[in-house]
């Protein structure tokens, strides 16, 4: 049995910028929502998709914005995209999916929490997202990332091959090299290659010596790297905290059975399809009744 966890925020962004725009009868832009509805419906046609949860950033800001002023916000998001977040959540719910609309936490936190809670109860957890933050959740072949657009699966060896560090060190990697998508600046001069080398040896930021003379590996520019980290170690630890996904999100589902997909909600889906001007989908979806 597999548990599929969907990154609704990523999917909505992908559809908004990748699918044709479309307006409903009221003149509202709904193209991304129509696309995500079709995409999720297609996913549910797969025989191995039996238990599913989808997380959305109901608001972009989270507890991380209270920790660091430079962390990502909703500023600059296209209004036509932002207006479709509630519709996309409705679409997922109408399909009968468990939906986690995050406010205090982020969508990625919900996916990490669900993974931690249910990974040992299934054969595999498939996190449908290419987001590098989520690589920290990968565990052997039990928990994998699946980029649906490119149909690429990352298990633990693949994460190491791609990023140079094991999943557990992904927050350390992002803290040091930075993550522009999340507003994490990183530590000056710490590039991806040198950071991977250092973390491969020491495992975590906390274990990296301040004094370059104490390093027992050869890394280009080691003196500068050590000096910069020593000067900004407190910042680095904050960035690591920002990059570390929370697994203590209070998800209401306590049993794997709560995530079983039993079919779409006929009344809700018919109403939503009428709003979106989407009619052909109703012929393809299995309903709970």
Regions found by a protein language model. Give the residues of each.
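Extended two-metal-dependent nuclease catalytic cores across DNA- and RNA-processing enzymes
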Residues: 22-23, 74-250
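Short acidic/polar active-site loop segments enriched in Thr and Asp
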Residues: 50, 193, 279
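Low-complexity, charged, repeat-rich alpha-helical/coil interaction segments
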Residues: 9, 59, 169-172, 176-178, ...
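Low-complexity, acidic/Ser/Thr- and charged residue-rich accessory regions of DNA metabolism proteins
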Residues: 231-232, 236-289
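Domain-level signal for Mg2+-assisted phosphodiester chemistry and nucleotide/NA-binding surfaces
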Residues: 1-96, 150, 268
